[in-house]
Amino acid sequence: PPDTMQGLVLMANGIGVGFSGNTIYPSEPFALYAYPLKYQISTEYPVVGLGAFGQSVFVGTTGNPYVIQGSDPGSLTMTKLPQKQACVSKRSIVEMNGGVVYASPDGLMQVTESNGLSSLTAGLINRDDWQSFNPSSFSSFELDSRYYAFYDNGTTQGCLVFDFGAKPNFHKLDIYATAGYNERRKDALFLAIG
């Protein structure tokens, strides 16, 4: 792979996908050492981060988001979604509920294969309040279909917990984690606090 490649994610079909600048690098299936130049895909805007879900990869950029789909690296297709909802934090990208959730300037967005891009926080929090949490600082995790966003707005650190169940809501916690790991086998979220 190129020396500058970062953000490696793995699709369900064994294709590794990384990026550098505005170039996407797919690998040969199950060969994460082989990234032929002929598979490269370019985006209009610089890539912020990636998120894999099913046979798809979410591409968060500084402009429009994209979705890459396909079963073979030679026939991957990339779709530019029409909404200008930039990804403001690569650490906000979380796979959950059959898609990818990420922080945009306007709120949390979800990308799924069936519904495309939709806002999860419209009606829950207005843009000014959202911006007061500095979404570009988010370090986020999922547990039991809840989205945990640890934030630092320069004066306050904390955690926003979004529950997108039957009655969507969110609340704040007075804890701040610098890192975390979702241990699926134990159904637990381990956090580095302090």
Across the structure, where does each feature detected by a protein language model lie?
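Disordered, low-complexity "stalk" and linker segments at domain junctions of extracellular
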Residues: P1-N13
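A short helix->beta-strand "capping" segment at the edge of beta-propeller domains
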Residues: P1-P2, A31-S42
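A structural/positional concept
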Residues: L10, V17, I41-T43
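Beta-sheet-dominated scaffold domains
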Residues: G14, T43-G194
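Blade/loop signatures of beta-propeller domains
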Residues: G14-Y33, Q69-G70
